[in-house]
A protein has these predicted regions:
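Active-site/ligand-binding neighborhood in enzyme catalytic cores
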Residues: 103-189
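Mid-domain catalytic core of redox enzymes
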Residues: 182-275, 279
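Conserved flavin/dinucleotide-binding core of flavoenzymes
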Residues: 2-7, 249-310
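Glycine-rich FAD pyrophosphate-binding loop
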Residues: 34-58
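Dinucleotide-binding Rossmann-like beta1-alpha1 core, especially the glycine-rich loop
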Residues: 59-130
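Extreme N-terminal leader/targeting segments of oxidoreductases
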Residues: 1-17, 36
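N-terminal Rossmann-like FAD-binding beta1-loop-alpha1 element of flavoenzymes
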Residues: 15-42
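Conserved acidic residues
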Residues: 16, 200-202, 307
Length: 310
């Protein structure tokens, strides 16, 4: 790890900055405050850092909370590259290898007429599918364009690997991260924990993941199969359900197998299972491991994804 010392502006007065929350947003905020030559301290109410960027190991596979695609060249990618000696291993999702059920390839490069309709915005089904894959239903033009240009990527080490890189670098430069600390109140000059302990700070950054306005909930399913029924396809889309085969996109993900990372904007996990039943016959008999969330926060009224909140 290279640390942050080479990126700080000169002539800046040091402040005591407390970052509340050690998810992706909190860790990046802590890194930026250190770059600004401030004294930084991080607290997290849970026993584990990472927030929704955590993973669960099962039978040698890392299962996350549904699919995560990193915007290559975006702010998060740039920050991770700054603090790491080794660049994260990225492989792009190819929209030409995603099949829209009843419609064909998401980006029909071998059909000039259909491709022209997509480019002119005259194909609503594919337009909705592009929005689903690029922004999980959120309208984020930058990510839509990135998907078409091969700049929305699966991360070899997973989202949790990016969290780990940031946390390791913070530790290396001496920024303490204390878990199991719940903040219950604030006062002029700091905050108070649930145990009545006062923590003094000039600036408090709240990065707890609390939604702004109304939370947008989705359902996710991650499942590893011992076969490859999609035969190299990167994914499937039907209505508001998307299935990505991470193993087909990135070679380090379940080699020789399938790692389906799935999301449904409505209808729950059963909606995902219905699509798998329809298009991947017999998948249940090939399950190695699975992880599901019937309701998990995707975003809030801001419409930003996790790597867009930093």
């Amino acid at each position: 790890m290279r640390g942050f010392d080479g990126y700080a502006p000169s002539g800046v007065v040091m402040k005591r900055v407390l970052v509340v929350g050690a998810g992706l947003h909190g860790l990046v905020t802590a890194a930026r405050e250190h770059i600004a030559k401030n004294q930084v301290f991080v607290v997290e109410k849970r026993k584990r850092i990472g927030g929704r960027g955590t993973s669960q190991e099962s039978f040698g596979h890392q299962l996350e909370h549904g699919p995560h695609l990193l915007l290559k060249g975006g702010e998060l990618h740039s920050m991770v590259k700054k603090v790491s000696k080794v660049k994260p291993s990225l492989r792009p999702v190819r929209p030409s290898k995603i099949f829209v059920v009843g419609h064909g390839p998401l980006y029909p490069i071998n059909n000039p007429k259909e491709l022209l309709n997509v480019k002119m915005g005259k194909d609503k089904v594919r337009e909705d599918a592009l929005r689903l894959i690029s922004g999980w239903g959120q309208d984020i033009p930058e990510r839509r364009n990135a998907l078409i240009k091969g700049k929305l990527c699966v991360v070899g080490e997973g989202w949790s690997g990016l969290v780990g890189r940031l946390a390791s670098t913070l530790e290396e430069v001496g920024i303490p991260i204390q878990t199991g600390v719940k903040i219950t109140d604030s006062y002029e000059g700091g905050v108070i924990t649930s145990k009545g302990v006062k923590i003094e700070a000039d600036v408090v950054k709240m990065c707890t993941g609390e939604p702004v306005g109304e939370a947008v909930k989705v359902s996710t399913l991650d499942v590893v199969l011992d076969n490859r029924p999609l035969k190299g396809l990167h994914g499937l889309v039907k209505d508001d359900v998307a299935i990505l085969d991470l193993a087909a996109i990135h070679s380090v993900k379940a080699p020789g197998m399938s790692h389906f990372s799935c999301i449904a904007l409505s209808g729950g996990v059963s909606k995902i299972e219905d699509l798998l039943d329809e298009r991947v016959s017999g998948w249940r008999s090939h399950i190695i491991t699975r992880r599901e969330n019937n309701s998990i926060t995707l975003t809030d009224s801001r419409g930003l994804l996790s790597d867009g909140m930093i």
